[in-house]
Amino acid sequence: MKLLILDGNSVINRAYFGVKPLTTRDGLYTHAIYGFLNILERMEKEEQPEAVCVAFDLHGPTFRHLKYEGYKATRHAMPEELAQQMPIMKDVLRAMNIPIYECQGWEADDVIGTVGKICSQQDWECVIVTGDRDSLQLIDGNVHVKLVISKPGQTTTTLFDEEKFREEYGFEPKKLIDLKALMGDSSDNIPGVAGVGPKTAKELLAKFGSLDGVYAHLDDPSIRPKLREKLEAGKENAYLSFDLATIRPEAPIDFAPKDAIVQPYNRLELYQLFQKLEFVRLIDKYGLRGAAADAPKPEQKVQFLPRREDMPADVDSCAVYLAGDGSVGLAWGEGVCALTPMEAQMGQLSLAGKNLIFHDSKTAMHRLDELGIQAGECVFDTALAAYDLNPSSSDYTVSKLATNYLGLSVEDADAAACAEALWHLRPVLSGELEKNGMERLYREIEFPLCRVLYRMENRGICIDREQLRQFGDMLSRRISDCETLIFSYSGGEFNINSTRQLGELLFEKLGLPPVKKTKTGCSTNAEVLEKLKNKHPIVPAIMDYRMLTKLKSTYADGLMKEIREDGRIHTTFQNLVTATGRLSSTEPNLQNIPVRTDLGAEIRKMFIPKPGCVLVDADYSQIELRVLAHIAGDDAMRKAFCDHVDIHTATAAQVFGVPVEEVTPLQRRHAKAVNFGIVYGISEFSLAEDIGVSRYEARAYIDNYLNNYRGVKEYMHKVVADAREIGYTETLYGRRRYIPELKSSNFNVRSGAERIALNTPIQGTAADLIKLAMIRVENALNEKYPDAQLLLQVHDELIVECPEGIAQEVAALVSREMENVASLSVPLTAEAKFGKSWYEAK
C-alpha cells in the first residue's frame, strides 16, 4: 500500500511562482490553487497511491523559534496574492476528501516525518511530495521523496530513494542533518559553522562520518589550521544547527494511513468552489458538470417564461440560441420553446422580419445561412456585450453569463434554457454597459462591426492556386538544396528538425559554444542561432532551412488547404478574443503573413482580385504613435505630426541632438525602435537587444527620449498611477481593461501589468479607430460604389476589391474615410494603393 503526502506550503509556493498569474472576474488570484491541483493530479497519476493527504504549516512560533530566535528570520512574508488563496486551497482539498494535517507549534516537516514514521511502522510505502530538500533526511526503505522543481511554465520532479540519495550526496540520508549542521541553511537562517561551505562540509563528513566524528578528530592533520579554528569557534552553532535541522517525527497528530485512503469527491461542494474560482476546464476535467443539477439554485433575478410547443408567427422580437447539436432555442416575452435539429432544417423556423437577440451574432448568422433560414435584424449580441464589459475573460458561454448576471444555472446544451437566458440577459447587460460608460463603444463600434465582419467572411479573397503551387514547388527545391548544404557541413545526414540531434551536432561535434540550456539540453531556438550565425557556415544554412520549411508548411501548403470551391479563402475574424480590442483571424491566420523577408513577402502575390478587378490596400501611417501624441498631449510630438515631419527622423534629431537634415539612417532606425518601444513599455535590456547596443546606450536613448518628449513621460507616469488606483485603464472610446496585477507584490508580475496599463489605451484606441474605419468604409462603399467590397483587415490596413475602372475613386474614398474617422489633435493619414495582387497594392 502506498500513501502520498504533499508538503502543502512548499507545493503551493512552487505553484504560485511557477504558474502565470490568473484572476477571476472579481480580481481573486487563483493560479497557486490551479498549479497545486495540476501537481497533485500529476503525482497521483505517476505514483498511483491508495491514500493521499496534505500537511500545512500553521501560523505562529514553533519549538525551533523558541530555541533560536533567528530561526527563519530572514524569510519574506507570504505574498498577499498567495495568502488569499491558502484558505480556499484547504477548502478545495476538503471538498476532495483529502485529509489535512497541521499541528500548532510544529512545522509541516515534522508532521510529514511523523506520517512517514507511522507508515513505515505499518509497512506502508510513503512518498513525500515537496520542493524542499529538508525532507530528504526522512528517506528510508519505506519512505521516498519526490522533489518538485517549478519554473514558469515548467514543473519537473525527481524521485529520491536511498540509492538515488547516496548517488547524489555520497552518504546516507540521515547525514543530511550533519551536513546542514556544518554548512548551515540560509533559507531557514540556520547558522552552521561560519566559513564552512557545502564542499568542505561534504569532505569532512566523507572522512569522519558525522558531526560528532568531526569534533572527535579536530586534531587530525588533514584538517587545515584555519578550518580547525573555524570549527572550534563554531562548535556551539554547529550543534544548535543540528537540532534546528533535525525533523522530529513525534508531532502529536491523530493519523493512521487508512484514514487517508482515497475517497470520492464531494462533487457538489467541489463544483461550487471551481465555479467560484472560474476553473471551467477543471469542472469538465473532474467530471463535475452533472453536479450542477444537484446544486442549490442561486437567487434568481428573473421570472421563468412558460414552455411552449412553438413560437407564434406574429412575435416580432425573440432570442435565438443555436446549440452545438443543431437544436434551436427560441424565447420571447410570453414563452420559450426548442426545435430539434430536424425541425429547424425542415423549415419550421421562420425568423424573417423579426428583431433578434443572438449570442455571438456573427457565428449565429453563418449557422442560419447553413440551415437556409432567412434571419431578421439582430438587435443585441449578449456575447459581444459581455466581451466589452470584461475583455480579459476566457469564458463568454451562456451558462457562465447566466450564473454571473442572472443567478440562473443553465447547461449550454439546453437550447431552450439558453434562449431564455439570452432574453433576460439583454436588459441586464445593456444596463451594465450604460453603467460602465461603454454604451458608445458597443453601439457605435462593436455591434455594427459584427455585420461588417460577417460580410467580409462570406466574401473571402481570391487565391492564385497555380502560382501558389509553383511557389510551393520552388520552396521544396530550395529546402532540398539547403539540406544538401547542411549535410555537407555536418559530414553526414541527420534529422534537422530534431532539437536533440541538432544540438549534438552544433555543440558536441562542431564545438560551438552553448548559448542557452534547457532541461533537455542546449537550446537551438532562433535567438540562439542568431548569436551563432557568424561562428560556422552551417548556422545560416539551418536558419534558411527553418525559414523555408515554415513558409512551405504554413503558407504554401497551409493556404492551399484553405481554398474553397469558389477559389477563395474565407478567414474567420475573431472579435471576442484579445484584451486590447484588436481583431485576430484564424483558419487561416492572415494577420501574420510575412513581410520582413523578400521571400515571405512573395506570398502576397498569391492574393489576387477576381477577373476585371484590382485590390486596393489602404494603410494607416504610424497610427499608434499618433494616438500616443494625442493622448499624452505632447507638444513636440504633435508638432512633428502636424508639420508632416517624419516622426522617426524628428525623434532621432531630439534623442541624438543633431539637426533633422543630419540624421543618419542608423540613427533613424534606432529612433524608430525607441518610438515603438516606448508604446510597448520596452526595457533598456530589450531595446539594447533589438538594436544591438549596450544597455548603457539603450538607457541613455530612453532617457533622452523622455526628456525631450515630456508629455509622454508625464503620461506614462499618470496612466499607470491612475490604473493602479481605479483598477483599470481605458481607451478614448471607453474600452476598459482591468489589471488587478498592478497591486501584485511580485515585481515581475507588477512590471508586466504596468506595461499593459501603459500600452492598452494606445493600442486599444488604435484598434477602436480601425474598427470605426471598417464600418465607415463598408457603408461608404455600399452607398457610392456597390461593386467594391471590403475583404480583409490586417493590423492597420484595409483591403478592398473593386472593378479596375473605379480603382482611383475607391482608393481615394477608402483613404478619406480612414483619415476622417476621428478628430484628434494630430492628423490621421492613410495611404491607399492598388494593383493586380496584394503584393502590388502594398
What are these model-predicted stretches?
Residues 3-4, 8, 14-53, 69-70, ...:
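Conserved RNase H-like, two-metal-ion catalytic cores of nucleic-acid enzymes
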Residues 22-24, 73-250:
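Extended two-metal-dependent nuclease catalytic cores across DNA- and RNA-processing enzymes
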Residues 152-180, 187, 300, 326-453, ...:
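Active-site-proximal helix-loop-helix substrate-binding element of RNase H-like nuclease domains
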Residues 234-344, 356-361, 418-595, 614, ...:
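Conserved "right-hand" nucleotidyltransferase catalytic core of DNA-directed polymerases
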Residues 331-334, 360, 383-411, 416, ...:
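Function-dense linear segments that define catalytic or interfacial modules
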Residues 433-445, 449, 769-794, 798:
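Active-site palm subdomain of RNA-directed nucleic acid polymerases
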Residues 458, 570-571, 575-578, 653-786, ...:
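Conserved catalytic core of nucleic-acid polymerases
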Residues 477-480, 484, 488-540, 707-755, ...:
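C-terminal polymerase-core module
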